[in-house]
Structure formats: structure tokens, C-alpha cells
A protein has these predicted regions:
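Alpha-helical DNA-contacting segments of helix-turn-helix folds
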Residues: 62-71
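Basic, helix-initiating cap at the start of DNA-binding domains
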Residues: 1-45, 51, 56, 62
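C-terminal peripheral helix-coil segments that are non-catalytic and often amphipathic
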Residues: 1-8, 88, 92, 133, ...
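Hydrophobic alpha-helical connector segments
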Residues: 77-110
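Tryptophan-centric aromatic hotspots in well-structured domains and transmembrane helices
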Residues: 56-57, 127, 165, 169-170
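Amphipathic alpha-helical segments used for helix-helix packing
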Residues: 67-68, 101-126
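Amphipathic, non-transmembrane alpha-helical scaffold segments
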Residues: 14, 125-136
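Membrane-interface starts of transmembrane alpha-helices
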Residues: 153, 157-161
């Protein structure tokens, strides 16, 4: 007597392979950095062929960005809270950003990714579109609400959002000093003084 077996679901198998590739990429990015990361090493770690990787991603940069975004859960609806207290809301958001930058898993891989964008304009544009622009847009939406409530002046919201995040990223990227709660509070206070 033979038993009818269902053939494996290719979509499920592909999803398993895809997840293995993303995990291997994130792991290797943290271990060897962007420059030394190869598609061959990713394929070997994930237990797939290079052709499987290239079926889903056109190049290393696209794969690394997808792996990074999957790791940090960055591609979700982003909102900045609106409690009515702009200063508290901005402290919360900037504090969350600082916590992410201080997370060793995040920091190591983000620094590696930023190394990659130096020589890969396509990767730089994708990072901007998929990670930075959505976050800046959410911040600008909160600032726009503050403008409408009369809490801040009519200013260029692109500049205002970058004024908020710029000092933190500068200090983190160049390691010019610690990013403490006091530092975050000072950045928010100075930003609001400039905007009110």
C-alpha cells in the first residue's frame, strides 16, 4: 500500500531559504563587515547556491540592506508620538534612536552598512529611501502638527528634522563623545529653541 504524499510547497521552501540567506547575511555582516562580505560566503553559511541568492537580490548591496532591515524590523509604519508635549515626544524619539545606536547588534551592522554606502551609490539611495526618509517623514509629520498647534514657527521641516537627529548621528559616527540622556535632552532643548 502506498501513501499519497503531498509534494513540498515550493513557496515554503523558498521562504526558508530566503530567511536563511537573510540571517547568514546579517551574521556575516557583523563578523566581517561590508567590504569583506561575499555572496559566496553568504551562500555557504545559508546552505544555498549563489544562484538562489541572485534570484532574489541583484547584488550584495540590495541583499545586505534587506538583511539589515529585517534584523532591526525597520520597515514598518513609523509614527512619532503626539502627546501634545512636543519636547517630551522628541526626547522619547531621540532616546529610542540613541538606544538603537547603542545596541551592539545594531551598531556593528549599521556601521558596516554605512561603510558600504561610501562606494555604492545605489545602496546609499536605497538606504535613504527605505530607512532614513520614512523616519524623517514621521518626524516631520509630528513637527508639522506642532506648527499647526502654534508650538513652533513656520520653518523648513526637512532642516528641522535633520537639526534634531544630526548631532546624535555625528557624535555616534565620529565617536566624539558619549550619547547620554543628558546629551539627548540638550539636543532637544537646543532644537526647540531654534524652532520656537
Amino acid at each position: 500500500m502506498t501513501q499519497d504524499r503531498k509534494p513540498p510547497n515550493p513557496a515554503r521552501r523558498n521562504q526558508r531559504s530566503r530567511q536563511a540567506i537573510l540571517s547568514a547575511t546579517a551574521d556575516l555582516l557583523g563578523e566581517v563587515g561590508y567590504t569583506k562580505l561575499t555572496v559566496e560566503a553568504i551562500a555557504a553559511r545559508a546552505g544555498v547556491g549563489k544562484q538562489t541568492i541572485y534570484r532574489w537580490w541583484p547584488d550584495k548591496g540590495a541583499l545586505v540592506l534587506d538583511a539589515y532591515l529585517a534584523l532591526v524590523g525597520a520597515e514598518q509604519d513609523l509614527t512619532v508620538p503626539d502627546s501634545g508635549d512636543l519636547e517630551a515626544d522628541l526626547r522619547l524619539v531621540l532616546g529610542t534612536t540613541v538606544n538603537s545606536l547603542a545596541d551592539p547588534v545594531f551598531e556593528q551592522r549599521y556601521r558596516a552598512l554605512l561603510t558600504g554606502i561610501q562606494d555604492d551609490p545605489k545602496l546609499a539611495a536605497a538606504l535613504l529611501d527605505r530607512l532614513l526618509k520614512p523616519w524623517l517623514a514621521a518626524t516631520k509629520q509630528r513637527l508639522r502638527a506642532a506648527q499647526q498647534a502654534g508650538q513652533i514657527r513656520k520653518v523648513d521641516l526637512d532642516v528641522a528634522a535633520e537639526l534634531l537627529y544630526g548631532p546624535v548621528y555625528y557624535r555616534w559616527l565620529l565617536r566624539t563623545g558619549p550619547i547620554s540622556r543628558e546629551y539627548v535632552d540638550a539636543v532637544v532643548a537646543m532644537t526647540l529653541r531654534a524652532l520656537t
